[in-house]
Amino acid sequence: MQSPLSLRHFARKPLVRAMQPLLLSLGLAGALPSLASAASLEIGAESRRQSFDIPAGSLEAALNQFGREAGVLLSFSPELTAGRQTQGLHGQFGVDEGLQQLLAGSGLHAVAQDGGYSLQSSGAALEVDRQVVVGSRAPTSISELPGTVWIIESAQLQEQTKGGVPFKEALGQLIPGLDVGPQGRTNFGQNMRGRSALVMIDGVSLNSSRGISRQFDSIDPFNVERIEVLSGASAVYGGGATGGIINIVTKKGEAGAARFNSEVGLRSGFETSQDHDWRVAQSVSGGSEQVKGRASVAYQKNGAAYDGSGDQVMLDITQTDLQYNQSVDVMGSLDFAFANGHSLSLGAQWYDSGYDGDKGVDLGRNFSALRGQEPFEIEGGASFDREPRTERTQFNATYHAPEVLGHDLYLQTYYRSEEMAFQPYPSIAFTGTGAINPGRSYYSASQQDTDYYGLKAVLVKEWDRFTLTYGADIERESFDSDQALFDLGTAAQTGGLVADEYAKVGRYPGIDTDSDSLFAQGSWKATDALTLSGGVRRQRTNNEVGDFVAAAQQIQISKGNGTSADAIPGGEKDYQVDLYNFGAVYKLNKAQQVWANYSEGFELPDPAKYYGQGTYSAAPVNGHWVLQKGVNVEDSALDGIKTKQVELGWRHYDGALDAQLAAFYAWSDKSITYNRATLLVEQLDSKKRNYGLEGQANYWLTDNWQVGTSALAIRSQQKIDDRWEKQDVTAASPSKLTAFVGWQDGDTSLRLQGVRTFNLSDDGNVLANGQFDGKDHKIDGYAVFDLLGSQALPVGTLNFGIQNLLDKDYTTVWGQRAQVFYSANIPAELFDYHGRGRTYSLSYSVEF
């Protein structure tokens, strides 16, 4: 598993690589008309009447039976019919009349198209009847879910992103329980309800055993149809969702003639000629109700960013930056609708986001800025043999088959491969005279690769008042990493601006993770108003850790100090956990419900940063470093952490008021901390809890004016010496408040919005012995405002925006956390990442 001395060259690939998947997708899209023709059925029975005897019950089962008996092709998305009932069909009917009878009261209607029929929403359903899969693995009405569910529609997201708000920041604005977003590449610390979230694209997890926080550096918002959010601990989709689930649903093709969507945009603070970001995106979709597809490419190029004082924002050399960055997102999808409700959806994505410039942080000649001898500056002339970058390839196929032994069957198979490279980072030790100590110093950048694939199978059986959802998940993941070492003399002479690679060594031990799960979820409509639900998930996870020579010893060997070293033993560890949930939803009326639930989530915190640590002899013995003690599987295995949560909530949706409010309390018996010297994980046997309120309310004052607000009021604590103390600010979530006022009048819309994050403090770092070190920290809150707008033109739409309307100069939450993490041996100014100042955005989009 571990090959620490080998490394693939991580060179920038040309844009032509991005075009290859696009050309393939365009070829598939071009074949849609012929594929649709082959899939179409000739129907000649529209006017013929025949006898039917279809019982009342599941609408989807009734439609499938009707299609078989009538000999007609019915095309519909399973999300449309999930959870809906029919009164049945008995007697003599024609096709049109029979469909009308079956669909009565469902909010759906049938449309004759391409020799068959397709189902469409009549638009009469309330928001609470929206179908989502995030809460129960199969399409379910929000009104039946005992939990906090949010849906971010494409129009809401596009209003933000076309107005210039970056994706991570837009999510923090639109999802009440999600922390405000950082402005660099990382989304570390952007928690939900104070804990980590499971992020997915079309149901495929973006989380990995190695906790690299780049889940939102994964897709261009041009390709997002909607975002489904379930707040709080959940085991519905497996591990990692101790704070909630965010499922990013991508855009699909639409039936009909080929349709094109074009978008261009520009963003600038007008501080210098380099202060600009620009983007361009293009998609094509089309087909029939039987076969349809979409292909797209989105490209963005970023320049420099400046804060509210007119100074350039410091480049993030810890988790990497998005200044001087370019990204390409290529996506393609095909959707097939077969007879009797069967469907197949295929999706593919290639995403590449990385550094593309010649600027870097000047650390001073001989790294003098690291000693506080001179300020850190951003200068030209940067040349790195390894550049910060995220590259991801993902494929998935989803098949739906109704009437499989009386069940609905959902099958999904998927594959994800990603490579993540980091910025060159200085680990420099100085002598008493201020000279560099070469034996204890190095300049390096890591690369971390993950391959992830699996299969999900879900069966749904509906009776009159009871629905059973059960199935299995199979997941396989392989993680490997390495570290490029750069010539120390060259780096010192250039202030770190030139990184010439001379060796490659291991960074973390290799980790293979296998996970197999069985789950079952039941829902019972005890009355027309009361729905009870409950479920269990049994998950078995196997971690196989490779033997690993500690990174520090590999670096010493690369310097010629020794020729070999003992490996810290690897090994295997099995985890088996049972996770339960149960809840109740009571419908006060058609527009509102109250609910209560208990749920559990599970996570295995970053085994790569836990294992592979060791203490060696002070010097090599006959050229060999002798291991004295190490963190290994046999002697100090990492424990999984189970999070439990209780929640009470209320939601209300009608024509004027949309509101949702939940009170939650989550707790776990273990927690983790980060060693400030090594930045590695240490496990604590101390309890941790989060509790608070999450809510949102939007109200239409008139047909033109809307106001709204959302809030997360949260407190995060850990138990030290039988007392509840404040949790470390690097992991706790600050409370948050958002508000907006919007106006629209036909073709014009305006929105003024603000977000306020509140102060957060702790009592110091928690050490491995469970005690505080006495160095307390504080994160200062701040408030920023944006003005967004749009104007429909005779052809297309113009969107515009001003971010940070008041040009406030502030340090982001991540910038303040980074100073806590990294400033033990380096001046904090290097990690003082400010927010971007007043920035103007303009974009134009057109569909044709």
Where do the PLM segments sit?
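Extracytoplasmic beta-strand/coil segments of soluble accessory domains associated
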Residues: 119-120, 168-205, 225
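Short acidic/polar hinge/loop motifs at secondary-structure boundaries
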Residues: 169, 189, 204-231, 282
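A beta-strand signature from Gram-negative outer-membrane beta-barrel systems
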Residues: 219-263, 847
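Gram-negative outer-membrane beta-barrel transporters
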Residues: 263, 525-532, 540-541, 656-677, ...
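Transmembrane beta-barrel wall of Gram-negative outer-membrane proteins
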Residues: 272-303, 307, 311-358, 391-402, ...
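Face-selective signature of the C-terminal outer-membrane beta-barrel domain
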Residues: 337-352, 388-554, 585-587, 657-663, ...
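Membrane-embedded beta-barrel scaffold of Gram-negative outer-membrane proteins
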Residues: 398, 408-426, 587, 593-599, ...
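C-terminal beta-signal and adjacent terminal beta-strands/loops
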Residues: 602, 756-765, 790-848
